[in-house]
């Protein structure tokens, strides 16, 4: 997809009503500081449109980024941030669950996992939660540039094992710095949001990203 127009159309807080959007949506979930905003900026080809921060827990709303007046990239609040009160965490959880269950336009959920570490209990809980809400999430193993090339296969296997992924479940190693994995991500997103006649996803590339 060629990015011609980007706009933060909708911001949903814990007291807000979920919108009925006119375009298909793909959502991004992950623990605080996993690189979610950086990934979304890379997808939008913008340096800092989605606000990034070294402070975990910065995203506290559901943010809908309008792409070309044809789809939304949806940024969900990060989880696992220790300095947030249990009451606030519970509110965020209900907000995310409500979105996953009620959005009629949501086509797929991408779950971000830091490739340097085994999935945490919170990661596994979020994965199970997404599955229980009717989606088989695509896993994005972020911060690929932070490990050596020789470590990639081992760490990908650790993420797959830690989440209990099936052979056919898709995992994409990704770096917001080098943009490795960006093309594969967009090919997948296009396959979910574009009409079939417009979707020219290369089947060979699709096979590669499932390795």
From Swiss-Prot:
Keywords for this protein: Cell cycle, Cell division, GTP-binding, Magnesium, Metal-binding, Nucleotide-binding, Septation
SUPFAM superfamilies: P-loop containing nucleoside triphosphate hydrolases
Binding site for Mg(2+): 37, 59
GO annotation (BP), single: division septum assembly
An example Gene Ontology molecular-function term: GTP binding
Binding-site positions, GTP: 30-37, 57-61, 75-78, 142-145, 174-176
Domain EngB-type G: 22-195
Any one GO cellular component localisation term in the record: cytosol
Cofactor: Mg(2+)
Family affiliation: Belongs to the TRAFAC class TrmE-Era-EngA-EngB-Septin-like GTPase superfamily. EngB GTPase family.
Its job: Necessary for normal cell division and for the maintenance of normal septation.
NCBIfam families recorded: GTPase_YsxC
Protein name stated in the entry: Probable GTP-binding protein EngB
Species annotation: Lachnospira eligens (strain ATCC 27750 / DSM 3376 / VPI C15-48 / C15-B4) (Eubacterium eligens)
Source species taxonomy: Bacteria, Bacillati, Bacillota, Clostridia, Lachnospirales
